[in-house]
Amino acid sequence: MQKTSSTTKLVIFLVVLGLISYLASLYVDWLWFKSVNFPSVFSTILLNKIGLYVFIFLATALLFAFNLRLTRRHMGPVEEPVYDDEEGRVIYLDDEKTPWKEFLRGKSSRWLYLGISLFAAYLVSSVAVDNWIVVQQYINRVPFGTTDPIFNKDLGFYFFNLTFYKFAYGTLMMALILLIITLGSIYLINASTNLLFGNWRQFSFAKGHMATLLAAIFLLKAWGYKLAAYDILFSPAGIVYGATYSDIFARLLSYRILLLLSIIIAAVILANIFVKKFKWILISLGAWVLVAVLMGSVYPSLIQKLVVQPNEFNKEKPYIENAIKYTRQAYGLDRAENREFNIDYNLDISDPSHQSTIDNIRLWDWQPLRTTYKNLQQLRSYYVFDDVDIDRYTVDGEYRQLMLSVREIDQEELPQQAKTWINQRLMYTHGYGLVVSPVTEVAEEGFPQFFVKDIPPRFSTDLKIERPEIYFGEKTDNYVIVNTSQKEFDYPAGEKNVYTRYEGKDGIKIKSFARRLLFGWVLKDYKMLLSSDITNESQVLMNRNILDRVQKVAPYLSYDGDPYIVINDDGKLYWVLDAYTVSDKYPYSEPFDKQRNNYLRNSVKVICDAYTGKMNFYIADESDPIIKTYSRIFPQVYQPLSAMPEGLRSHLRYPVDMFSIQAQMYRTFHMTDPSVFYNKEDPWLIPNETVEDKQVKMEPYYLVMRLPEEENPEYILMMPFTPKSRANMVGWMCARMDGDNYGKMLVYNFPKQETIYGPEQIESRINQNTEIAQQLSLWDQRGSRVYRGNLLVIPMGNSVLYVEPLYLQAENNRLPELKRVIAAFENKVVMEPSLDTALLKLFGQNQRVESQQTGVVVTPGELPGATVAELAKSAREYYDRANQLLRDGDWAGYGENIKKLNETISRLEEAAKP
């Protein structure tokens, strides 16, 4: 007894401990949501979960309690003896040798049945509670305004209604199956002895009770077949995704027959209570199984082989049209405007209308640039450049495309002896600043030309940063405590450090020892209780990773994997995150991933302050019914895009992830003629390019350019296409993103009678160019690693220019340097030290190119014909820079420039040889 009592106490203690831990975590969540000004999100989610849980719990408990009460009432005492034992004693069913009889029918059985009811209710409600969002979507649903071609229902039915009905069906089916298993077990246990001795009188009510429940399951199954019939619109088995001929005329028919059979079986089961014709149940069940097998697989297969395949196109044409129409709608491809791009190759590179494009041709790829940033601007081991972003800014009055990378803190990179609790929680709390460089400009050493660099930030343009501290970012994961008596490390200044205090309002105030105890419990950090640096005014900053942060507020959205930083007009730093509404419920739409998602909208733009962590969610696509539904559920979360500050709106980008999916779909679904689609006469491909020394698929890239028939340069995201059977280019797609044109898509088609070089053909021509091949081989022999950058296809006027950067990296030095630019136009390929000289060599003696790369005007007379003179100039520059770095105490920079000076002198000696 003592052992049992101790075990019970231990179980109770563990349950209470778990409950306290859960409530403490819940309270901390509430404090966090309150601190970020989204308390309504917490309360909406919590109340909906509680409401759904309680409703299903009570409904399931009542269902079980009612049926168990009926069962108990109709299991009356059995008075007839069962057998005599060896000593002649008569044993009754309620004898001590059958104690379960009393357990099932006696006074204590009420507690048993109550426990069963509560446990079953717990199981069903626990499974169902996470579908609270499904219920709310159904309640707050918004119609699409478009109907499907088979059932003529608004598409919102499949997104909201059908999902809710399937949830209700699954929950009811689970409850009924659990109930019939429970009651069947009780009836069998209670009447086990009667079964052995042929006493069937106790089964009259049991058979009727179980028959009623079984009939209910078949009626519910009939509803399930009705719901399943709608799934043919998402069938992956046909010539296109969605319902095809065999689905309509075979599978849909099978669902309707099975629905009718399920109702008949339910009626037969109920009738058998009175008629006692058990064989009719067996016959109806046999017919049900037979129809399920024959109509579910055999009959559709016969229809496909005997009816469809001999005349496939005519039979499938309407469904091909459906697939084309609805796939284009689901990905917004139906809104893409098609234009002709008439090629003539009469490009005047000196035309002022092309200057903005030339000034913004991207020569820096993010991978080598990040390595360069790390080597030149990391400054301390605990700083990290996690990513390189690209965006456009107006700099000194000019529209420029820039590369930016945030200098975040990575506490894992602190020296081992510095990984103390104070350093990781109170002192090293934030990153500092960022680096900015233009996409085209290259310094003499082959390094980027910095617009913003160093700590504290130094500026060479009118860009300004007033708040460089990074408390929230992509690499920032752990929690910190700010406004303590311990100063926060801000940034290094020579041999000294500069310290600061957090001035933001974000964070949960400690306030009291009770809260400190609470946070110590939830965060599993007992040192919070012992630290004398923490005061009641201290704030806990949690969920500092920006993706985790926004997902906690809106977990039902999908987020782009590439947030980017923006320098706002006020000098503050903000993260921009693209959020998507994604679904697998768009009829006939081809899926884009393994989860069969086939609907995609970039419906939300999220702005997150890098200093305070404040989040704002803006609706970017007001035509999306899904985000309209969410905004009804969470009205305090979403704002119209017009409410976003203009300085931030000017930096909104069309997301690469979404554009990649759209381009992938457009490869096939640009064919809008059913016959062309069926015969696959004109499928397109995303071309390959050579990056480093590997063949990879091209990725969409951002450009500043003046589109054909447009007056001003603008920021676009583009992707070229090639036909499947050839390597030449057939067209290109772009997404616009400036001003009112944001989100508009254009597709430019090249004339079919013209042959325009595709990226793979240009790469092949580069490989076959003897001068380029010799130079690459020479670098390789000298121990330098050649890194070939992204090939850019750049439409200009009625022509196409191709540009590819080339980086060199010494074996003993992981610092990539941009050393050459390869450019191609029409039938000519050149490789030169800079973009401007490459363009001059391409376009001849009558052209004049002024490039932002060097900031000088280059004419044919300045081409590197006088090699010795140029090398002598470079040697003087390396020497002067080395002396300056020596005076500044930069020994690493001094050594690097002396090394390059020696290399230049060696080249001078070779060039001077007769």
Swiss-Prot record:
Recorded topology in the membrane: Multi-pass membrane protein
Location within or outside the cell: Cell membrane
One GO CC annotation: extracellular region
One of the Pfam families matching this protein, by short name: UPF0182
Keywords: Cell membrane, Membrane, Transmembrane, Transmembrane helix
Transmembrane segments: 10-30, 45-65, 115-135, 169-189, 214-234, 255-275, 280-300
UniProt-listed InterPro entries: UPF0182
Family (UniProt): Belongs to the UPF0182 family.
Protein name: UPF0182 protein Swol_1161
Protein's organism: Syntrophomonas wolfei subsp. wolfei (strain DSM 2245B / Goettingen)
Record lineage: Bacteria, Bacillati, Bacillota, Clostridia, Eubacteriales
